[in-house]
Amino acid sequence: MTDSAEIASKITSLIGNDRVRTPRGIEPSAAVVIATPADAAEIAEIVHKCEADKIPIAAIGAARTLSEIRRTPVAIGISLERMARVAAYEPHDMTIVAQPGISIADLNAAMAPSGQRLPVDPRNPRASTVGALIAAHHAGPLRLSEGTARDLLIGIQYVGHGGQTIRSGGRVVKNVAGYDLMKLMNGSFGTLGIITEAAFKVRPAPGNYTLALAAPPTAAEAFAAACALCAAAPFAHLEVTSPRVSATLGLGSQFSLLAGFSGTRAEVDYLRETTARIIPDVQFLADADAMRTYCALRDFDFSATSLAAQIAVPPAELPQALDSCGTEFRAHAASGIAQVMTYDVLTAEAARSTILKWRGLVRNARGHVRVVHAAPEMRAALEFFDTPNNGAFELMRALKAAFDPAGIFNPGCFVGGI
């Protein structure tokens, strides 16, 4: 069903005319009609109706993820904009429970008076929601020291098949019931259900953030320096960027090493001394200058590229994998993860050939590739995810069939068209 008026009328009958609207901003690439339920009960009604009528749906926060990867818009986007508050916060227990539509920036602002934060740093946290953080497994440079949402999630609630509300885990760190279900929802891209609440463990917000910058002559020297730093001390993040990416960050057209660290004044002084001993020509930024450069690094915008993909390999294999790809990159040097990109004007077939080339090279390094940005006209020609071995793929298909037998949750947007 693609007729927007007919779709809208079906949802209006459930939640009212004021809760259904046309897409705006980047949403037209994600959905034909936008529904804005106020709570999990209204989402459950929509799911029940859409299963009966075979109408595909998908959760939408800022719509950024779906607008970047869907080949065609889903019939109904379930906007979580009305579900954007902190449900519970216990500073002494260091836990927080949030609705899926709240942005990471607003979530951390709520904890700032208590000196705490959710230590994940997806691109543009003002436009990155809790729901997308989990469903798309977003992460940034801090994954080196803090992990990802998968490591911090202690409880989850979502609406699934039949409009049922499913809960797993709890609101305290010691409660580990449902551990596997939380892992399953993480990175599922909304194909198993719609998240309505999430509980996280949080951590103290560190102070005195300092950024060390260096410009090694080659990528190999940049990665060697990052490896030496990683072995010497605990850094918050270690990034290596190619010349064009460095220029975008305001660092000049050169290979760049960006090493960030925080802590007490004594800890920061020690890390400065350690860094200077390993990289004699290093430059240090502090306070607003450090944060400005870090934010530019974290928020790097792939929309200026023609094609971008994320690769993940064993950390020791990353320098060679990037050299083989022969492209511009932003690399999380000690994590084995990087984004590779090209700025060349590509046809759909050229884009497909480029992704196949990257996949072959990365597979040789025992890794995998996921497309993170492609122009809409290219998407039909691309497989956004690697295809796993037959056993793993059959397991994924079985899980999809068990969790979403009607096939309405964000169909065709995951591995192998799941």
Language-model-derived ranges and their functions:
Residues 24-89, 95-100, 105-120:
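Glycine-rich N-terminal segment of FAD-binding domains in flavoprotein oxidoreductases
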Residues 55, 70-75, 79-81, 108, ...:
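Conserved glycine-rich FAD pyrophosphate-binding loop
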Residues 215, 225-285:
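A conserved active-site cap/scaffold subdomain adjacent to cofactor or substrate pockets
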Residues 33, 250-262, 335-344:
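A generic structural motif
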Residues 113-121, 125-239:
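FAD-binding subdomain of flavoenzyme oxidoreductases
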Residues 1-30, 49-57, 62-64, 362-381, ...:
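N-terminal accessory segments
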Residues 40, 217-219, 261-268, 314-318, ...:
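Helix N-cap motif at beta-to-alpha junctions
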Residues 6-12, 219-241, 311-327, 351-362:
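Short amphipathic alpha-helix segments
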